[in-house]
């Protein structure tokens, strides 16, 4: 896995147990791709079953952006499998390197407050958070 400085800064923040990490930068600056690489690493190194949510303003935005990048990362690392991808629910399962645990990476849109209310998770990545209203953001946390 080829990693960028954005990846390294986010990894450092995760290791330091930062509760909130904000990435700012221009288009195509590797923010989304680097964070998705980090999500794969978190799932692989997990010492328990983890739930990781990847959220964006609309599902088409998510599908053409973060989800496409996530599949590409999994394929490049020979981790993608149809058996581990629930295309109906937009969920990917990733086995930990020790083989004992399986993390769930779920993709969903935040275009309805009913979709974001209540679910518990270990990690949350809001892609293009500036396009999400504050109430929805608050519900996601």
Regions found by a protein language model. Name each.
Residues 1-141:
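Phosphate/NTP-binding elements of NTP-utilizing enzymes
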